[in-house]
Amino acid sequence: MAQIFNFSSGPAMLPAEVLKQAQQELRDWNGLGTSVMEVSHRGKEFIQVAEEAEKDFRDLLNVPSNYKVLFCHGGGRGQFAAVPLNILGDKTTADYVDAGYWAASAIKEAKKYCTPNVFDAKVTVDGLRAVKPMREWQLSDNAAYMHYCPNETIDGIAIDETPDFGKDVVVAADFSSTILSRPIDVSRYGVIYAGAQKNIGPAGLTIVIVREDLLGKANIACPSILDYSILNDNGSMFNTPPTFAWYLSGLVFKWLRANGGVAEMDKINQQKAELLYGVIDNSDFYRNDVAKANRSRMNVPFQLADSALDKLFLEESFAAGLHALKGHRVVGGMRASIYNAMPLEGVKALTDFMVEFERRHG
């Protein structure tokens, strides 16, 4: 079978080695004669899976001991509600920085629970889309927390700065599309959350990192399965968790550790991004309209100079084993999502195709 490279924004490509192991273990896991999908989440075998996954995840991100790691349902959209329901306490407002589609979605959900103070960080610089630097973000004095999204998958916009707003500002961040792709200083955040389906594992699992002093403040109306304290007190097993997604994510963590960890992923991701953006920038046939300082290394949107060729580009790229390159309906064009599991050879195959396509149709 020819090599297929999946550039989907999520559910996204998974490491081939991980899929092979899961395939081998699917019907007989750990010699039990059953699938990991069939064993009890409270049995000792799965408890070991859960504990190892948390330990490996903590090690990969150097999560401090005063932070809890929760394995949850609900995805990023679930956390759009969970953050205000857990962190507001007796306050009625929170700061939200709008830099793109997902930040705006979080703001829309937060309005059900508080009065967000919204700061529009979007700006145009020399005709290119960009984000104002953090030093220009206008935060309020009475906010329970400040929320932002470091990587906008649809817009292809990244905020790579490390937040430094002082110890009194609780920073909450949606890391769904950039978690584990580069080192981060977890201690600068109060809450970090990430849906698994981009850089962690299969859809269905959400990971939350929360500073322990923020627990115990949930709104009385907060659903139990979104209550950080209840999840923590029950080892993320207040209800039946998505066991297969948890297991497979644990395999991804071990794959990451075996391949140099987050620091090595950071280097490889930089190489992949430079290769792809290099082809775009050195061509009049392709374009990307994001300022270089805010370009995402995970999600690279690009347009063809002649949009009439879009359909042909997608058909021919798919036939060449380059799948899921169609851009989001909001922005159109193309989008290549190049998360950790996308090897450098996959990006090389894409750029070779782009150069050849331009030669034939430019």
UniProtKB/Swiss-Prot annotation:
Name this polypeptide is given: Phosphoserine aminotransferase
Amino-acid biosynthesis among keywords: yes
GO molecular function: O-phospho-L-serine:2-oxoglutarate aminotransferase activity; pyridoxal phosphate binding
Disulfide-linked positions: none
EC number from the UniProt entry: 2.6.1.52
Organism lineage: Bacteria, Pseudomonadati, Pseudomonadota, Gammaproteobacteria, Enterobacterales
N6-(pyridoxal phosphate)lysine: modified positions: K198
Superkingdom classification of source: Bacteria
Biological function: Catalyzes the reversible conversion of 3-phosphohydroxypyruvate to phosphoserine and of 3-hydroxy-2-oxo-4-phosphonooxybutanoate to phosphohydroxythreonine.
Cofactor(s) essential for the protein: pyridoxal 5'-phosphate
Catalytic activity: O-phospho-L-serine + 2-oxoglutarate = 3-phosphooxypyruvate + L-glutamate; 4-(phosphooxy)-L-threonine + 2-oxoglutarate = (R)-3-hydroxy-2-oxo-4-phosphooxybutanoate + L-glutamate
Organism: Escherichia coli O139:H28 (strain E24377A / ETEC)
A GO biological-process term: L-serine biosynthetic process
Subunit field text: Homodimer.
PROSITE patterns referenced in this protein's UniProt entry, alphabetically: AA_TRANSFER_CLASS_5
